[in-house]
Amino acid sequence: MDISGGAAVVLLVLALLIFSDAERIPEKEVPGRSILGLLISALLLLASYYMFEVRTALNDITDGNEAPERKEAAAAVNVSEEPFSVYISGIDVYGDITQQSRSDVNIIATVNPKTKQILLVTTPRDYYVPIPGVSNGAPDKLTHAGTYGIATSMATLEELYQVDIPFYVRVNFTSLIEMVDILGGIDVDSELAFTTGNDSGMVVEVKEGLNHFNGKEALAFCRERHALAEGDNQRGKNQQAVIEAMLKKAMSPSILIKGPRLIDQVSGNTETNMSTSQLQELVRVQLAGMKGWNVISVAAEGTSSTQYCYSYSGGPLSVIVPDGHIG
């Protein structure tokens, strides 16, 4: 798989901010204008319905499972006062989000609630790194860490970057396709012109510059690496481009019309350990300041190679050896 929702938790929070604005309809008495009064009442009722859908979805989403020590660490984070990191894991399956599989999207979103900045760091799926608690120091593909569970993927990235990652979001192929379609498609700025192959889901002619994608086209754009000279390095950049496009579309006024459907879809195909109260606190912070978020994207890079991997005994595999550069 190769992305999802954008940073699904960030996408969700931004969408929630828009929905929350609908609740803040000014109350104004207009004597003798009963029709206007009924209209305002109807709008308030509609806004209440949106917020009910939002809260219900939040309760459904926050159902991730993890070790007790990780739960305690996540619960202790004050998301309105201190920077925090969220691991976005895109697994390579359709359907049930609880399946354990390879993590082909590995993005760390570091959020600063005070400065309203989000840093997205993409790590290639083929990054050649040790898997803590599994490989005994032997290197493996980062994507293989996902087969040992979400906590193992988080530990691998924490060791690689020497950072704490208290939160995670898991999404899959289905998450991306359905959320992009509910948004009415997205406009993605591609650095390159290329054609995706059937192994990426479908054949799509991608042009350099702006492309309008539906869900399946966006997934194919994110999955393709064989047609790219830089392979997995470029694919990571393409994933970030899709996330940014989804965030931009989620902040448009049209999201209000599709609000309940989007929220329902996110709840069905997303798993996170961020609590309902923490997500709601992020909403509160935004409403208090109403300042926009600045999103910065960077990607870890490396050198393509063929090496033996701990989790695969059938021979050497294509990997990316880290070179210590993030750009």
Residue ranges and their predicted role:
Residues 2-8, 25-42, 46-327:
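Non-catalytic, solvent-exposed segments at the cell envelope interface
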